[in-house]
């Protein structure tokens, strides 16, 4: 290859980046590719354009101050909620009737949960090492202590689980020097994402995993990392999938404050919005990834997995914006779930026309000072 041709190829590559195109980048020895998404090149849309339908379920009991995350299984809803005393799990049936409230002695240290379909169990993680096992109706089974840190887990078939360690530079939040491990809880089978950065205290991101069961895909978006990963079930491996290029505006692990001045530096980052310092609401629905940015940018993002087109929107249906910092608390692959208090909806629709029949039918029964929880099931267009 002549020098002129090499220069032309280099020039073309640079131009693609400058224009915000997504181009494949070789990421490993097996020629798997990661696609770059220019996060400054997005199409601003109205969220209503993505919505096919909305249905509403009033939950029977108000047992938490706000919802953290939610999962569904068969005819039940499992919501992890937060109170001043810590976290709990509340189980409802699909009609919103209370099935059971699960409270914990170490509620302040309860961090995540997962449904284990093969075992027909609910697992609740606490203290970054304890698994509290329950039957699906909330009946306690046993409490297990793990030999390695665990912030979030998800079953991936064949009695294997993908475990996120908590994301630290030390043994408090890493597994044999890595952030992700494939394990059957008898041994560590594989390790992914070598530890980096200088964070010393583990964290449990909400909605770190986004499943696309229809396409047999699992996506992972860890905290303080500007890359979305995918889990290949056939190979039993995690690969980088989408590199989100924020042009230096995203607070990655290498930029995260540490040491004696960590609290003060982090406070300044938050108050002055120096970086995008967090993301929430990571979910997949109808072939699209969703997440919300916090800090220097506060918008919602959606990436169409068919063509990698990036969309941005600032509010939800009918220009509504819930109080929660984590609006999309869950997804079943087709629907996004939003949990709001009735007074939020009542206040919003005082002077705004409602365009969704299910919400229209609900409005007359809503009170401006009502604290009942309303679960909104938002069906996303294909």
Language model region names:
Residues 24, 76-82, 120-126, 159-172, ...:
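Short beta-strand elements that form the blades of beta-propeller/WD-repeat-like
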Residues 61-64, 103-110, 145-151, 195-200, ...:
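Short coil/turn segments at the loop-to-beta-strand junctions that recur within blades
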Residues 60-66, 90-119, 123-127:
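Blade-loop segments of beta-propeller domains
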Residues 241-260, 306-333, 346:
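Conserved blade-ending motifs and adjacent loop-strand segments that build the rim/top face
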Residues 37-65:
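A short helix->beta-strand "capping" segment at the edge of beta-propeller domains
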Residues 126-171, 191-199:
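Asp-box/WD-like beta-propeller blade repeats and closely related beta-sheet repeat scaffolds
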Residues 268-331, 340:
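Loop/turn-rich, solvent-exposed surfaces of beta-rich toroidal or solenoidal domains
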Residues 65-69, 108-114, 148-156, 200-209, ...:
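Repeated scaffold domains used in trafficking and secretory/extracellular systems
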